[in-house]
Swiss-Prot record:
It comes from Xenopus laevis. It comes from the Eukaryota. Keywords: Cytoplasm, Hydrolase, Lithium, Magnesium, Metal-binding. Its cofactor is Mg(2+). GO terms for cellular component: cytoplasm. The keyword Hydrolase applies. Belongs to the inositol monophosphatase superfamily. The keyword Hydrolase applies. This is Inositol monophosphatase 1. GO terms for biological process: inositol biosynthetic process; inositol metabolic process; phosphatidylinositol phosphate biosynthetic process; signal transduction. Phosphatase involved in the dephosphorylation of myo-inositol monophosphate to generate myo-inositol. Is also able to dephosphorylate scyllo-inositol-phosphate, myo-inositol 1,4-diphosphate, scyllo-inositol-1,3-diphosphate and scyllo-inositol-1,4-diphosphate. Also dephosphorylates in vitro other sugar-phosphates including D-galactose-1-phosphate, glucose-1-phosphate, glucose-6-phosphate, fructose-1-phosphate, beta-glycerophosphate and 2'-AMP.
């Protein structure tokens, strides 16, 4: 039986991600014009390249699939909605790791997820400076540059290495009582270590490769998580909400791990913060 979405991933999403990545890499050699999305988050940056790449991705897909829906980071920032419907929907982060991009820190990715009936069917994450193309298709496995991926399978959190990020919130009280205290609780279990790469999509792909045993973060958006979520699960990993419940793409928080045991153990340690959902429904508690 023909798998139309597999073909869509292989011959459209991958080629568009690679083309977008070449634009990003070229822009890294030029002066970057930096903007701040909101005065409430002075570390939440955006550049003209983010906007250019997203427009290119959406226009390329619309040529072939004019009836499809789109949720893009820069489109939402400009006032577009981010409600996920049953319609085939492309969920796009043109540059995941914009702060890395601004500083030329070499971990930036183009992230393209595709959902039908609110379920992610496939994801493509192109870590363009590294030239690593991560793909995951529901029920078909996940790969990096054609090599099949498998999580570490680690179940003992005391033998784990975990990735997280401090995010863009620079409120001193928040940093002290939430961000750093969550890290402290995990380090004191103890665990082997905590790392930060600066891009949610690549962080999750590192879990899929087995290079890290887990990644957690709160304050994300659906475009940060969509593509990589299926890459992790197809590599044998577990995706949960930060509370330990079922993962919800619109919840703005995630734990992705090599095993359910580690994911649930992390959830027990985390102080949960209230977050506005991407779909505008009631605030997460």
């Amino acid at each position: 039986m023909e798998d139309r979405w597999q073909e869509c991933m292989d011959f459209l999403a991958v080629s568009i991600a690679r083309k977008a990545g070449s634009v990003v890499c070229a822009a890294l050699k030029e002066d970057v014009s930096i903007m701040v999305k909101t005065s409430l988050a002075p570390a939440d940056l955006v550049t003209a390249t983010d906007q250019k790449v997203e427009e290119m991705i959406i226009s390329s897909i619309k040529e072939k699939y004019p009836s499809h829906s789109f949720i893009g980071e820069e489109s939402v920032a400009a006032g577009a909605g981010s409600t996920l419907t049953d319609n085939p929907t492309w969920i796009i982060d043109p540059i995941d790791g914009t702060t890395n991009f601004v500083h030329r820190f070499p971990f930036v990715a183009v992230s393209i997820g595709f959902a039908v009936h609110k379920q992610v069917e496939f994801g493509v994450v192109y870590s363009c400076v590294e030239d690593k193309m991560y793909t995951g298709r529901k029920g078909k496995g996940s790969f990096c540059n054609g090599q099949k991926l498998q999580v570490s399978g680690q179940k003992d959190i005391t033998k784990s290495m975990i990735i997280t990020e401090l995010g863009s919130n620079r409120n001193p009280e928040f940093i002290k009582t939430v961000s750093l205290s969550n890290m402290e609780r995990l380090l004191c279990i103890p665990i082997h270590g905590i790392r930060a790469v600066g891009t949610a999509a690549v962080n999750m792909c590192l879990v899929a490769t087995g290079g890290a045993d887990a990644y957690y973060e709160m304050g994300l958006h659906c475009w940060d998580m969509a593509a990589a979520s299926v890459i992790v699960t197809e590599a044998g990993g577990t995706i949960l909400d930060a509370t330990g419940g079922l993962f919800d793409l619109m919840s703005c928080r995630i734990i992705s791990a090599s095993s359910r045991e580690i994911a649930e153990r992390i959830a027990k340690e985390l102080q949960i913060i209230p977050l506005e959902r991407d779909d505008g429904k009631s605030t997460n508690s």
